Amino acid sequence: MSESNRKSYTDFNVELLEKEKQKKKLKKPDRYKVILINDDYTPQEFVVYVLAVVFRKSMDESRQIMWRAHTEGSAVCGVYSLDIARTKVAEVHKLADDAGHPLQCQLAKEEEE
């Protein structure tokens, strides 16, 4: 094989690799909001505690989220990948069940911009 043939073969491979890279642009993974649902039975102090423990919010942030849920019916606690969001929801439900409270939260897929 001559030198000119090798060069064109290499150039051809590089072109193919570049085209494949363009085709395989990865999309960002979906993100999910964890939404706290207000109820009339769970004490506000417990909700603040859960937000601080599960979502690692400051006491101030926890109170703000709790109050938003209380006044608006629901509030976003955070936005995460699906696995992490599911884990957060499970942790909230476990803490609430263990304490005998009906506190609920749910997932909602975040809208793409």
UniProtKB/Swiss-Prot annotation:
Gene3D superfamilies xrefs: 3.30.1390.10
Biological process terms in GO annotation: protein catabolic process; proteolysis
InterPro entries registered for this protein in UniProt: ClpS (IPR022935), ClpS_core (IPR003769), Ribosomal_bL12_C/ClpS-like (IPR014719)
Pfam families per record: ClpS (PF02617)
Domain of life of the source: Bacteria
Cystine residue pairs: none
Assembly behavior: Binds to the N-terminal domain of the chaperone ClpA.
Chain's role: Involved in the modulation of the specificity of the ClpAP-mediated ATP-dependent protein degradation.
Classification via PANTHER family: ATP-DEPENDENT CLP PROTEASE ADAPTER PROTEIN CLPS, ATP-DEPENDENT CLP PROTEASE ADAPTER PROTEIN CLPS1, CHLOROPLASTIC
Family: Belongs to the ClpS family.
Protein name: ATP-dependent Clp protease adapter protein ClpS
Species assigned in the record: Leptospira biflexa serovar Patoc (strain Patoc 1 / ATCC 23582 / Paris)
Classification lineage: Bacteria, Pseudomonadati, Spirochaetota, Spirochaetia, Leptospirales
